From Swiss-Prot:
Domain of life of the source: Eukaryota
Alphabetical keyword list: Chloroplast, Membrane, Phosphoprotein, Photosynthesis, Photosystem II, Plastid, Thylakoid, Transmembrane, Transmembrane helix
Recorded topology in the membrane: Single-pass membrane protein
Organism: Huperzia lucidula (Shining clubmoss)
Gene name in the database record: psbH
Function: One of the components of the core complex of photosystem II (PSII), required for its stability and/or assembly. PSII is a light-driven water:plastoquinone oxidoreductase that uses light energy to abstract electrons from H(2)O, generating O(2) and a proton gradient subsequently used for ATP formation. It consists of a core antenna complex that captures photons, and an electron transfer chain that converts photonic excitation into a charge separation.
Name of the protein this chain belongs to: Photosystem II reaction center protein H
GO molecular function: phosphate ion binding
Modified residues (Phosphothreonine): T3
Pfam families on file: PsbH
Localization per Swiss-Prot or TrEMBL: Plastid, Chloroplast thylakoid membrane
Main location: plastid
Post-translational modification: Phosphorylation is a light-dependent reaction catalyzed by a membrane-bound kinase; phosphorylation occurs on Thr residue(s) in the N-terminus of the protein.
């Protein structure tokens, strides 16, 4: 059955579009992994910053933290 599916996929004609041709160079590194940690620490800092931001916003919304002189009306 798998050979039939691959035979069918070989016969189908792939439609090439302008957008596809423009984006093809961006996909040329598909499947390749850079050695080491890469940008993982930057992503960790971004995630931690977003978590702190979310906690601050939730505490302000929940009135756990009040800001003096700033009226909150929601």
């Amino acid at each position: 059955m798998a050979t039939q599916i691959s035979d069918i996929s070989r016969r189908t004609k792939v439609k090439s579009t302008g957008l596809g041709n423009a984006l093809k160079p961006l996909n040329s590194e598909y499947g390749k992994v850079a050695p080491g940690w890469g940008t993982t620490p930057i992503m960790g800092v971004a995630m931690a910053s977003f978590a702190v931001f979310s906690v601050i916003i939730l505490e302000l919304y929940n009135s756990s933290v009040s800001l003096d002189g700033i009226p909150v009306s929601w």
